[in-house]
Curated annotation (Swiss-Prot):
RuBisCO catalyzes two reactions: the carboxylation of D-ribulose 1,5-bisphosphate, the primary event in carbon dioxide fixation, as well as the oxidative fragmentation of the pentose substrate. Both reactions occur simultaneously and in competition at the same active site. Although the small subunit is not catalytic it is essential for maximal activity. GO terms for cellular component: chloroplast. Keywords: Calvin cycle, Carbon dioxide fixation, Chloroplast, Photorespiration, Photosynthesis, Plastid, Transit peptide. This is Ribulose bisphosphate carboxylase small subunit, chloroplastic. The gene is RBCS. InterPro entries: RuBisCO_ssu, RuBisCO_ssu_dom, RuBisCO_ssu_N, RuBisCO_ssu_sf. Heterohexadecamer of 8 large and 8 small subunits. It comes from Nicotiana plumbaginifolia (Leadwort-leaved tobacco). Belongs to the RuBisCO small chain family. The basic functional RuBisCO is composed of a large chain homodimer in a 'head-to-tail' conformation. In form I RuBisCO this homodimer is arranged in a barrel-like tetramer with the small subunits forming a tetrameric 'cap' on each end of the 'barrel'. CDD domains: RuBisCO_small. GO terms for biological process: photorespiration; reductive pentose-phosphate cycle. Residues 1-56 form a transit peptide.
Length: 180
């Protein structure tokens, strides 16, 4: 009995060695044998993709006398129709509109620390309460007009708050004071 256990273990180790050296054929895929084993690395970036030599460089945002307010703040101010469209998108997405205003600085600034951070200069005062249950974009625009009358020298922004995930999903400037 002991000799049969010993001989079967020896046979098993021999078959494992033989199986490690065998390569099973691929079915439905190309065999790796057709590809070269080593390839020369091409470090020339001109061979990656070409647009036919028609390169157009975009000018970057000039940092002098230009303030960054929010995402896409480099675009021109939104018109009333564009504001309505953004607010309708916010409402269709199921987010709660909320207005905030800032009387001193409506742009990103670093007050307490010199290293950059997402929330630097982003604490704004809430205008009234969030507009839970609001379904009409013109109601939100009416609140923007009220905020503009109450604080004509303030920045007013509209945020879309997802009350399920408890996060702010959209934010854009609705009004900037004269000269900004």
């Amino acid at each position: 009995m002991a000799s049969s256990v010993l001989s079967s273990a020896a046979v098993a180790t021999r078959s494992n060695v033989a199986q490690a050296n065998m390569v099973a054929p691929f079915t439905g895929l190309k065999s790796a044998a057709s590809f070269p084993v080593s390839r020369k690395q091409n470090l020339d970036i001109t061979s990656i993709a070409s647009n036919g030599g028609r390169v157009q460089c975009m000018q970057v945002w000039p940092p002098i006398n230009k303030k960054k307010y929010e995402t896409l703040s480099y675009l021109p101010d939104l018109s009333q129709e564009q504001l309505l469209s953004e607010i309708e998108y916010l409402l269709k997405s199921g987010w709660v509109p909320c207005l905030e205003f800032e009387t001193e600085r409506g742009f990103v600034y670093r007050e307490h620390h010199h290293s950059p951070g997402y929330y630097d200069g982003r604490y704004w005062t809430m205008w009234k309460l969030p507009m839970f249950g609001c379904t009409d974009a013109t109601q939100v625009l009416a609140e923007v007009e009220e905020a503009k009358k109450a604080y004509p020298q303030a920045w007013v922004r509209i945020i879309g708050f997802d009350n399920v995930r408890q996060v702010q999903c959209i934010s854009f400037i609705a009004y900037k004071p004269e000269g900004y």
